[in-house]
Curated annotation (Swiss-Prot):
Keywords per UniProt: Amidation, Disulfide bond, Ion channel impairing toxin, Neurotoxin, Secreted, Toxin, Voltage-gated sodium channel impairing toxin
Function: Beta toxins bind voltage-independently at site-4 of sodium channels and shift the voltage of activation toward more negative potentials thereby affecting sodium channel activation and promoting spontaneous and repetitive firing. A mixture of Cbo2 and Cbo3 is weakly active on the human voltage-gated sodium channels Nav1.4/SCN4A and Nav1.6/SCN8A when tested at 200 nM. In vivo, is toxic to mice when intraperitoneally injected.
Species of the source: Centruroides bonito
Keyword Signal (UniProt): no
Signal peptide residue numbers: none
Protein name as catalogued: Beta-toxin Cbo3
Other information: Negative results: a mixture of Cbo2 and Cbo3 does not modify the currents of the human voltage-gated sodium channels Nav1.1/SCN1A, Nav1.2/SCN2A, Nav1.3/SCN3A, Nav1.5/SCN5A and Nav1.7/SCN9A.
Residues recorded with modification Asparagine amide: N66
Native organism taxonomy: Eukaryota, Metazoa, Ecdysozoa, Arthropoda, Chelicerata
GO terms classed as biological process: defense response
InterPro entries: LCN-type_CS_alpha_beta_dom, Scorpion_toxin-like, Scorpion_toxin-like_sf, Scorpion_toxinL
């Protein structure tokens, strides 16, 4: 599974500005989803890879980013 890491409180994606390989995104993806996860910056959001199937990613149901 893959997807954007999401803030549970406001429903927003984790933003990033350095596209491609990104230490911040990699660190956040691993912290949330475990050391097997990967991450990089895609379309100014942190995109996480190698997630377990039940991982919660953006968008959150009934929670829009505002």
């Amino acid at each position: 599974k893959e997807g954007y890491i999401v803030n549970y409180h406001d429903g927003c994606k984790y933003e990033c500005y350095k596209l491609g390989d990104n230490d911040y995104c990699l660190r956040e993806c691993k912290a949330r989803y475990g050391k097997g996860a990967g991450g990089y910056c895609y379309a100014f959001g942190c995109w996480c890879t190698h997630l377990y199937e039940q991982a919660v990613v953006w968008p959150l149901p009934k929670k829009t980013c505002n």
